[in-house]
Amino acid sequence: MPDKPNLLALDFDGVLCDGLLEYFQTAWRTYLEVWSPPESTPPDDLPPRFYRTRPVIETGWEMPLLIRALILGWAESQILSDWHSISRQLLEQEHLSPEVLGSRLDQIRDQWIATDLPGWLALHRFYPGVCDRLRVILEQDMIQLRIITTKEERFVRSLLGQQGIILDPGIIFGKGHQTA
C-alpha cells in the first residue's frame, strides 16, 4: 500500500477565505482614483454583477478593469467568455498597464490596512470549519501545509493571525513570493 500523502496545498482565495466583499471594495476604491467618476457610490447593481463575473480574474490588477468593463456596459456573458480580449482592449483604450493598475490597487489596499485594519479584515470571511481544520492539521504535524494565494503573503498572515493561526515562514506562497 502506498504511503499517505504528506503535503496539502490549499488555495486561500475562494477556498479557505471568501474575500469577495473586500475585492469589490478595493477594486471600487481603485476605480474611483483611476477613472474619477462623478458618483463615489457604486450603482446598486454593480456589486452583484462584479461577484458573478469575478471568476475571470487571474490577478488583482484586473479587478478595477472589470468594474470599468461593467460600467461601460459590457455584458456579463461577453466578459465570462472573452475576458482576456476585453481586458487587453480596455487597457489599450484607457492607456493603462497591468503594472500601473496593480500598483495602485496594492497602494490603496495598503493604505486601507494601515488606517483601518479591523474594517478591512471584517470584509473577509473564512468558510465554516476552515480555521478549526487548519488548527488540527497544524497541531498534528503529520502533513506539510502550503497555502497558495493571489494576495501578498502579509495579507494572508493578517487574516489568519486574526483567527489566532500563526504560520511558519515558507508555508504561504503568494504574490511576490521569493524562495530563499
Where are these regions (language model features)?
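Extreme N-terminal starter segment of soluble prokaryotic enzymes
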Residues: 2-9
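Alpha-helical substrate-recognition element adjacent to the catalytic core
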Residues: 15-157
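Generic structural signal for short, solvent-exposed loop/turn connectors between secondary structure elements
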Residues: 1, 39-41, 178
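Substrate-recognition "cap/lid" segment bordering the active-site pocket of phosphatases
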Residues: 146-180
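Residue immediately C-terminal to the conserved phosphorylatable aspartate in receiver
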Residues: 12
